[in-house]
Amino acid sequence: MKRGLRNGVAPCIPVAFCRDAGSAGHGATEAARPERSLQARGFASGMEARQGGDNFAGSVHDSRPARGDARKRHCQENNKTDRNQGSSNQSQNRRKKRIIKGKVM
């Protein structure tokens, strides 16, 4: 491939993919810039758009374990039937028996 067909800033990306970058100069496409799309939705300045993006990213990252736990609890609460409760009692009884056997030995 000729050197002239490549992007000078990011040589591994062909220039054809960087046409939409405009004056950005770093090879980012319009979809990769959340500030612009947020401004189009009614945010007044880029700073507000950036703050919203950062807060959203942080909250998603911080809440992943809690969301997983909540889903498990939700499924368990919805699926409680007599059969399921009986099986949970059986597993608790098994645990108790194992503990008792462990103490005897």
From Swiss-Prot:
Residues 61-83 have a biased composition (Basic and acidic residues). It comes from the Bacteria. Residues 22-105 are annotated as: Disordered. Keywords: Plasmid. Residues 93-105 have a biased composition (Basic residues). This is Uncharacterized protein YubN. It comes from Escherichia coli (strain K12).
